[in-house]
Amino acid sequence: MIEKQSKNVLEGIDALIDMLEHYEDTDKKRQKIKEKENEGDRMVHEILSELNKTFITPIDREDICKLVSSLDDILDNLEAVSERLVLYKIKKPPKYMLEFAQTLHKASYNVHEAIALLRNFKDATQMRIFCKEVHTQENEGDALLRKAMAELFNGKDAVEIIKIKELYDDMESAIDRCEDVADVVGDILVKYA
């Protein structure tokens, strides 16, 4: 079920990338991302419900909760970005948004692949590689944020600066949540592999 949730996150990111690459019908595209976020919320509820009914779990309950929560946070950030793009009446995507989204996609892909391997712990080495890649992408996200902010703060329109800063912060936060998932997967590996 967690694997389905991570796939849903990837689909949400794909929808955001589509929105940024083809920046028209933004309200319709925002709604598609909202649907992915709602689907994610349903999955969280379902997973936690099943967890409450299950006496013995293959991994610690706390780790399951952390995975589920961090994956949900990624979708929450995506929804916030798409909402702000529409509500703030952003005419075209800010310069670094697509690059943030692509970095987030790479990180989420690696998260998804690591989670898929959790099912049977067969390839701990490959899981570690996926987790290490997520950390690399998180560092790329941090560097991109610094670069984007430095350029942004050279602007003159304070309102525009605030709007775009919030968008960049949400994207970087989503990448950070991918790193949180990778950290939990790493913890699980230490405990069980």
Set out the residue ranges of the language-model regions:
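Cytosolic, long alpha-helical scaffolding segments
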Residues: 1-193
